[in-house]
Amino acid sequence: MLAAFQLTVLALIATSFLMVIGVPVIFASPEGWVKSKNFVFSGALLWISLVFAVGILNSFVV
């Protein structure tokens, strides 16, 4: 269970890093929002899911 928790935290950190870098680049590029809207929404959904997964797994690890 500890390994699953650690991998989920690692995925959350990686997703957060990609979103912090990717979203401003998308907004800065011409017509970036129109073409990359699905990337932003998919990344946000993945990030929210990982936050809940970390919270749930944390209750099993502690």
Swiss-Prot record:
Cellular localization per UniProt: Plastid, Chloroplast thylakoid membrane
GO CC aspect terms: chloroplast thylakoid membrane; photosystem II reaction center
Membrane association type: Multi-pass membrane protein
Keyword Iron-sulfur: no
Signal peptide (from-to): none
Keywords, in A-Z order: Chloroplast, Membrane, Photosynthesis, Photosystem II, Plastid, Reaction center, Thylakoid, Transmembrane, Transmembrane helix
Gene3D superfamilies noted in UniProt: Photosystem II PsbZ, reaction centre
Pfam families (alphabetical): Ycf9
Gene Ontology BP terms: photosynthesis; photosystem II stabilization
Domain of life: Eukaryota
Transmembrane intervals: 8-28, 41-61
Assembly: PSII is composed of 1 copy each of membrane proteins PsbA, PsbB, PsbC, PsbD, PsbE, PsbF, PsbH, PsbI, PsbJ, PsbK, PsbL, PsbM, PsbT, PsbY, PsbZ, Psb30/Ycf12, at least 3 peripheral proteins of the oxygen-evolving complex and a large number of cofactors. It forms dimeric complexes.
Protein family membership: Belongs to the PsbZ family.
Function per UniProt: May control the interaction of photosystem II (PSII) cores with the light-harvesting antenna, regulates electron flow through the 2 photosystem reaction centers. PSII is a light-driven water plastoquinone oxidoreductase, using light energy to abstract electrons from H(2)O, generating a proton gradient subsequently used for ATP formation.
Protein name: Photosystem II reaction center protein Z
Biological source species: Mesostigma viride (Green alga)
Gene expressing this chain: psbZ
